[in-house]
Amino acid sequence: MSNNDNNLPDTIRGAARIRLGHSELAVRPIGLGCMGMSQFYGPADDAQSVATIRTALDLGVDFLDTSDIYGAADVNMGAEIRGFGHNEQLIGEAIAGRRDEVVLATKFSARLTEDGKDIVMDGRPEYVAEACEASLRRLGVETIDLYYCHRIDPKVPVEETVGAMAGLIVQGKVRAIGLSEASVEQLRRAHGVQPLTALQSEYSLWERGVEAEILPTCRELGITFVPFSPLARSSLTGALQGGASFAAGDFRASNPRFASENLATNLVPVETLKAIAESKGCRPGQLALAWLLLQPFDIVPIPGTKRAVYVEENLTATNVALSPDEIAYISSLFAPERIVGQRYAPVHAAHVANAK
């Protein structure tokens, strides 16, 4: 990767890189999640998405997150929308000629059934190899930096899946491996086969279920934690109102926490967050990201956006200072018992070890 920071904006130039697990990979404190460029959050323009990714690189973002499934299914697991691998193809186009500027993370295991109406998990060793080859082609790269098992296949021992992933490292097709949405037990079993570099799961002020066991286990094992939805699907930006409605294809339309009977309650502490942010001269989302970055764990959040302006706004969170008392107060505002509703609808929870 390129280490020339001279042309980067002040918002990120001075940010120290974080080493991912025990690997040789190191990234800046905030990455970019690219899923929304292909599905779940309304229409997306491919040209705009490619431009956003390239602007992110210009701004110093060096950690991009995708998956082969992004673009393949709508929120209700119905018919194909953009196509399996669409998001990887977008990223491949965006990073062409700039590969050395990026730590590239993608995932496998989730695939559509033949009728396109459901998603199944496939952790068979033969599928691990097949999926990796396909991702390499779509991304237009020779090596994937960080390869995750997106969801663990309950039909295949995790040791077999991870063993096949370890084989990809030996073959030079992958530099490091990780899991997504795994339980502590699955994490330990997998780590016993091949040291894991990263675990990805949801974590934000709104969703703190990983704090009790997952995060301490990651710290014990030397695994970097990569939170997705660190802004709680825009809830922590201050942009949503209690009466917000979502289009049928929007992930939030079927998410219990965004149901009308829950959303108003869940947004109450956001009003206080907005006031604190105003007093500190920053945006609520920046404050929420700063809180996350200041947790006592190795964490690299990957907020997603389709618009370049929000990439820059998110990066500025690295400049927000919080005292220990401020961190504790903000934590208390979003105590888990104050957030109502499960974090996944049943159709998605079925594939997640820690879905509550």
Each PLM stretch: what is its role?
Residues 22-41, 105-119, 143, 148:
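N-terminal small/glycine-rich loop or linker at the start of catalytic domains
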Residues 111-209, 213, 224:
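Glycine/proline-rich, positively charged
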